[in-house]
Amino acid sequence: YTENGTLQQSFSLQEWLYKLAEVPVGEVYLNSIDRDGTGQGYQKELIEYIPADFPLPIILAGGAGKYQHFIEGLQNKKVDAVATAHLFNFIGNSLEVSRIALLKEGFNLAKWDMNICESLKGFFSHAEKLSE
């Protein structure tokens, strides 16, 4: 589907992925519009459509609601990265909890000081108040 899920396409997701592999793109952001924002987990069926020999990195998105969803997505060899907005925007200290859990599971993440993140939260909260 395209056009926000309103227009059904005549080709499958797998066919579309093969077409993407032929053009100069760096990665594929594979988002489930059915799961996006639900927090119910990634749509695992989408992963089944990714060819085993697919040459581009896949970023799986749409549906993460807890750090376990990241782990489930990243444990699949066809997935190179995961994404979320819902989890970080609406659920307390999810960024810190998720990063700690993923690092404990042995996933390779950029290392940065969580105190800096906290200070940035304060900065952006202050900036929002100033703009009101």
Residue ranges and their predicted role:
Residues 32-33, 62-63, 85-86:
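Short secondary-structure boundary segments
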Residues 34-40, 66, 90:
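Short, small-residue-enriched loops and turns at beta-alpha junctions
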Residues 71-113:
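C-terminal helical cap(s) of enzyme catalytic domains, especially alpha/beta-barrels
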